[in-house]
Amino acid sequence: MAFLADALSRVKPSATIAVSQKARELKAKGRDVIGLGAGEPDFDTPDNIKKAAIDAINRGETKYTPVSGIPELRKAIAAKFKRENGLDYSWEQTIVGTGGKQILFNAFMATLNPGDEVSIPAPYWVSYPEMVALCGGTRFFVSATQEHNFKLQAADLEKAITPKTKWFIFNSPSNPTGAAYTHDELKALTDVLMKNPQVWVLTDDMYEHLTYGDFKFVTPVEVEPQLYDRTLTMNGVSKAYAMTGWRIGYAAGPIQLIKAMDMIQGQQTSGATSIAQWAAVEALNGTQDFIPENKKIFEGRRDLVVSMLNQAKGIVCPVPEGAFYVYPSCKGLIGKTAPSGKVIETDEDFVSELLESEGVAVVHGSAFGLGPNFRISYATSEEQLEEACRRIQRFCGACK
């Protein structure tokens, strides 16, 4: 009898976590490494949010909470959806989890049966397909190519939907590409979904507040209100509020789904950390002034990285609308010989050789389901980004 579960054979470790770990190991050995693999802001959590957590500790808010979250936070979430997205949810239609990952996992665990399909646009966040596999679902990938700025086309979505499709995962702005959908681009997709009433929509809006220029964020139910009864809208405080370590994600959706997710979570972690929940109340209800300030910094970094990467031999880097990632193509380097003498045959080879040669850690695009590309997180200092891009330029120039 095998000791480990068969389900583990269907999943693989997170490539983004692996890259960050490799960078840390090399740094520990004395290597000069610039890590551009981590998907978290380099800003500190705002002081008013930290103070709310300290105040909660001093008030004794250190006990178990309701499984789906404290009422104060769930009411703040409902108010956020009304204020920012024009969506009406009662607080009972919301749920709080230990990060967005738990929200997604609970939704799949509560709904997927063997044979149920989940349509996942590629490139995708590395955890989507692994969660689906762990929960017994079947992954169905549909490519959103660089030709279309990594945005899924309606005709391709239509082809990907079958009678067995239970969920469609939508992520805008995207991790890993930074691509974000306009109202009209999203309307083309929701029109397809309206023709397929068996398909539920799981929208990951974690990067909602990180869009640049005059881009206006929209979420699926805003664009097509008739999807309200079969959409789970997920968000969190990690990215916009620089609270990745606080581990608070949340969602709103149909009450029967929220209750099912509550049941799963009740046998799993129960409520998220009480202190972090009180901090999240302040994040959602308190001042939002730092968000545009941080966005301006991110936008400047984006422009710097895109400009410098497009000067590197063999690299083509589109300009993303949001998040804090770029997803350049390294197709022009495939078949070239790296300074080590190794022939670069895949984007994974490119990333490995770049790390060994120049000490720059990025994530290979094949980990996200579409290559030959690589993902850079520009959530680090401008000085670090400039140096990393110079090293990438040097490495690409040395490939023959």
From Swiss-Prot:
**Family that this chain belongs to:** Belongs to the class-I pyridoxal-phosphate-dependent aminotransferase family.
Q: Name one Pfam family in it.
A: Aminotran_1_2
Q: What class of enzyme is it?
A: transferase
* Keyword Magnesium carried by entry: no
Q: Which InterPro entries match?
A: Aminotransferase_I/II_large (IPR004839), AspAT/PAT-like (IPR050596), NHTrfase_class1_PyrdxlP-BS (IPR004838), PyrdxlP-dep_Trfase (IPR015424), PyrdxlP-dep_Trfase_major (IPR015421), PyrdxlP-dep_Trfase_small (IPR015422)
User: Which GO cellular component terms are attached?
Assistant: cytoplasm
Corresponding gene? aspC
Protein name in the entry:
Probable aspartate/prephenate aminotransferase
Under the heading CDD domains, the entry gives: AAT_like (cd00609)
